[in-house]
Amino acid sequence: MQEIVGYLVKNPEVLDEVMKGRASLLNIDKDQLKSIVDAFGGLQIYTNGNWVPS
């Protein structure tokens, strides 16, 4: 799970596609996906990797 979160932090465009339902994460069940999306939902991530609370 940590590798997936790290990848999404480094590649925010992928996170955006996942959150919009246009991409999926392999080997992640729907409960795990919901946890990931919920965790990132309160954050705004810029392409340079800086996290800014929304």
Curated annotation (Swiss-Prot):
It holds the Pfam family ComX. It comes from the Bacteria. GO terms for molecular function: pheromone activity. Its main location: secreted. It is found in: Secreted. InterPro entries: Competence_ComX_Bacillus (IPR009233). Residues 1-46 form a propeptide. Part of a major quorum-sensing system that regulates the development of genetic competence. Acts through the activation of the two-component regulatory system ComP/ComA composed of a sensor histidine kinase, ComP, and a response regulator, ComA. This is ComX pheromone. It comes from Bacillus mojavensis.
